[in-house]
Amino acid sequence: MRRDTLAPCLAFAVAMAVAGPTAGKGAFADPDTLTLEDASGKAIQILTVEQLKTEFPQQTYDTRTPWTKEDEKIVYRGPLLKDIWAKTGLANVAKVKVVAYDDFVSELRMDEIQSYAPILAVERQCTKDDRSQGRCKGDQQFRPITMNEKGPIFMVWPFDRLPASYVPARNAIWVFFPVVLRADQ
């Protein structure tokens, strides 16, 4: 390694070591898991995508998103956020911080969660295109959401039930690949 590149590389390595496990994707290295935390950041439970599919009732939303065309709807399936949060025993908190795999953070008010019932979508309905591309086989009705489609977990809200003022002002509530739900006062 050349001497003029050694110092910047060492400085970066030291900065990452000092920042610790909360810096970058290393803090939550698996986008296929969701960690539920109390307000101090202590993990209460870790759920896999498979557990989100099998341990909670599934809700289906046929909805658009802030990024789809006005006439384009996608059918998503997954558990209600309020059902997942109730499992923590912290359902009475005022807010929930959602941390995404890319370190994006969104703050949700509990009244929003109760009023609009977002889901943590883990699947989307198979389409003709999915079948022709081999992403769905036989009578398969739903398939996993890919990273390119904002998965493997995507916080989906019933777009048509949201107040008009939420778009675009609250687009941050549609969290791509959330990995942590943290209680917040």
List where the protein language model places each region:
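N-terminal twin-arginine translocation
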Residues: 2-3, 19-24
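Bacterial N-terminal signal peptides that target proteins for export
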Residues: 1-11
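N-terminal intrinsically disordered, low-complexity segments enriched in P/E/S/T
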Residues: 24-185
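Bacterial N-terminal signal peptides
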Residues: 9-20
